Amino acid sequence: MIITLKQNAAAEEVSRLRGELEAQGFVIHPVEGTRYNILGLIGDTASLDARQIESLDFVDKVTRIQEPYKKANRKFHPDDSVINVGGVLIGGGHFAVMAGPCSVETPEQVIETAKACKEAGATILRGGAFKPRTSPYSFQGMGPEGLELLELAKKETGLPIVSEVMDISQLQYFDNVDMLQIGARNMQNFTLLKEVGKLNKPVLLKRGLSATYEEWLMAAEYIMSEGNEQVVLCERGIRTFETKTRNTLDVTAIPMMHELSHLPIIMDPSHAAGMSRMVRPLSLASVGGGADGLMIEVHNDPSKALCDGPQALRPDQFTSLMKEVIALRQALVECTK
């Protein structure tokens, strides 16, 4: 339930109402918006008389939320959330580009790639140290040593880093990682979601291969319900009947998520197509669709990559793409003036 307050609502009256509702066992989530302030109620509100609350002089209206996700709901939080990742803002008009190798392999590889990404305009360095692979015989990542190399690249470039955590036991190694990534396969690993929800660290939540929008937002709700509301959604392609591409990038998710939720949404065109030649058009489509950022795989030598080389861009290709992304972003801003 959402209680929308009038602009002239007295603090004493609002505090009294909050106290009465909390005494009944409800968790109150106050939100101060640019247009109005609200009190979000979490709990079983079936017994509450909405008309009685609405009759209070300082209450504008009462709205019951039908969707199962509350904290991730746009109705619960009308203004766009802005997430701070090591000084880089995402959402609310702030656009971020996460770029780097699928997996960390050598000091030279990650540092060379990181420097090239920063020079081209990337704002966050991505890199995998723990890799969830379809085959148990494939390269599984360097583990803690890979995270140390990412930290080294961070010191060299100043770029904050995002890396995937696959299991609760791995969290002990992520103290110096600026943003935790929950991969598509772990989107409904509820134990892991709850654990990262207890941390004061931004989380990048990738959509599951066959997840609906509601299932995706409910996964975000698991994180937020534990206290961590620093969540960024990432669409990375879903499984459809099409076989020409690895996955199908759901561009519709951008406006739909902006309508349903206040959380930022970024797009991962690299994993969606699985082919480097598709990254450019899918990236531009994502920018045009209103995405809050991009996540792009870049490798200094894709032909020698130990993981997903065919979908990685070379530094020169990424540089060319970033010029187009920046130009398109500027054009869109001009169109809205």
Predicted regions and their residues:
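Catalytic alpha/beta core domains of metabolic enzymes, predominantly
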Residues: L199-V298
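Active-site mouth loops of central-metabolism enzymes
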Residues: F95-E112, P136-Q140, P160-E164, G183-R185, ...
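Alpha-helix-loop-beta-strand connector modules within alpha/beta enzyme cores
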Residues: F139-S163, E195-P202, V251-I265, Q311-E334
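Glycine-rich, proline-tolerant flexible connector loops at the mouths of alpha/beta enzymes
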Residues: R126-P144, N300-P310
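Hydrophobic faces of well-ordered beta-strands that scaffold small-molecule active sites
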Residues: A96-P101, L125-G127, I161-S163, L180-I182, ...
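Active-site-adjacent beta->alpha loops and helix N-cap segments on the catalytic face
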Residues: R74-D79, S135-E148, S169, A184-N200, ...
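Non-catalytic terminal accessory/regulatory regions of metabolic enzymes
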Residues: M1-V97
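Catalytic beta/alpha-barrel core
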Residues: K6, M142, G158-S169, D178-T191, ...
